[in-house]
């Protein structure tokens, strides 16, 4: 199952991008034998600053056809890392070819796009900068792959 992180805004070269690249490389390497990956980051940018509706339209264009649509939103469900791994395995095992994890812009995700989501995940009630959410999500993808592989990376 291919994984796409769809995000509003551009991430500049720096420590956050290095961390994301590292975790996604690890995910690809670990997930390959599990039917997970490759992972990619797709950035969309509303250059006209037309708001959440315009961002949602750009995100919809970037969605792979037939993908599981999972938003990252403070109103979403909080999952443990093993629960996230199980959810990913479940989507993979039902034959889904693509998973799209969507990170909104500064104002969040347009309500119409949130309503279309198959699932929504929250990293807690706090609001996080999009660059940190990308890092946290990339790490959780790698952690999920190691959990499914039985690797000792995730310790309880």
Curated annotation (Swiss-Prot):
Its EC number is 2.1.1.177. It catalyses: pseudouridine(1915) in 23S rRNA + S-adenosyl-L-methionine = N(3)-methylpseudouridine(1915) in 23S rRNA + S-adenosyl-L-homocysteine + H(+). SUPFAM superfamilies: alpha/beta knot (SSF75217). It comes from the Bacteria. Its main location: cytoplasm. One of its GO terms (molecular function) is rRNA (pseudouridine-N3-)-methyltransferase activity. Disulfide bonds: none annotated. It holds the Pfam family SPOUT_MTase. S-adenosyl-L-methionine binds at residues 72, 104, 123-128. It is found in: Cytoplasm. GO terms for cellular component: cytoplasm. Keywords: Cytoplasm, Methyltransferase, rRNA processing, S-adenosyl-L-methionine, Transferase. Homodimer. Specifically methylates the pseudouridine at position 1915 (m3Psi1915) in 23S rRNA. Belongs to the RNA methyltransferase RlmH family. This is Ribosomal RNA large subunit methyltransferase H.
């Amino acid at each position: 199952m291919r994984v796409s992180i769809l995000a509003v805004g551009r991430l500049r070269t720096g420590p956050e991008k290095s961390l994301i690249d590292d975790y996604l490389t690890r995910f690809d390497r670990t997930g390959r034998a599990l039917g997970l990956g490759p992972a990619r980051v797709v950035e969309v940018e509303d250059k006209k600053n037309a708001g959440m509706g315009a961002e949602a339209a750009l995100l919809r264009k970037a969605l792979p056809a037939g993908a599981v649509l999972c938003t990252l939103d403070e109103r979403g469900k909080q999952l443990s890392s093993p629960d996230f791994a199980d959810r990913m395995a479940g989507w993979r095992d039902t034959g889904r070819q693509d998973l799209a994890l969507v990170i909104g812009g500064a104002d969040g995700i347009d309500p119409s796009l949130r309503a279309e989501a198959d699932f929504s995940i929250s990293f807690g009630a706090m609001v996080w900068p999009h660059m940190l959410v990308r890092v946290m999500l990339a790490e959780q993808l790698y952690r999920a792959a190691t959990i499914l592989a039985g690797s000792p990376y995730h310790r309880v």
